[in-house]
């Protein structure tokens, strides 16, 4: 898999996991989540759509805002990507 397509797959998976968490979090709106946890609404929307590659600190904050630890978010992301996903071809 080309590096660019791996990055796209990763960004879409991050967005899907965050969207799933937000929906499970009493179906909280992006606006409410952004306002309550001081996360930029536009960035949050772009992250959920998979068009923005967020910083690690932002991902951590979004995970916590959705009621999960960062490590649990990482596990969900790994499950979404599949065990054989890697950025580095060995």
Regions found by a protein language model. Name each.
Residues 57-72:
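DNA major-groove recognition helix of helix-turn-helix/homeodomain DNA-binding modules
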Residues 49:
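Short, conserved catalytic or interaction motifs in soluble domains
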Residues 1-5, 74-90:
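Short, charged recognition helix plus adjacent turn
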Residues 25-46:
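Short alpha-helical DNA-recognition segment
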Residues 22, 34, 63:
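The alpha-helix within a helix-turn-helix
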Residues 1-27:
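A short, Lys/Arg-rich alpha-helix, primarily the initiator
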């Amino acid at each position: 898999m080309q590096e660019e397509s791996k990055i796209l797959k990763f960004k879409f998976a991050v967005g899907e996991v965050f969207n799933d968490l937000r929906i499970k979090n009493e179906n909280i709106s992006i606006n409410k989540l952004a306002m309550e946890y001081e996360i930029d609404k536009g960035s949050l929307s772009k992250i959920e759509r998979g068009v923005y590659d967020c910083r690690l600190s932002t991902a951590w904050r979004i995970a916590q805002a959705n009621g999960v630890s960062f490590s649990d978010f990482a596990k969900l992301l790994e499950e979404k990507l599949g065990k054989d996903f890697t950025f580095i071809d060995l």
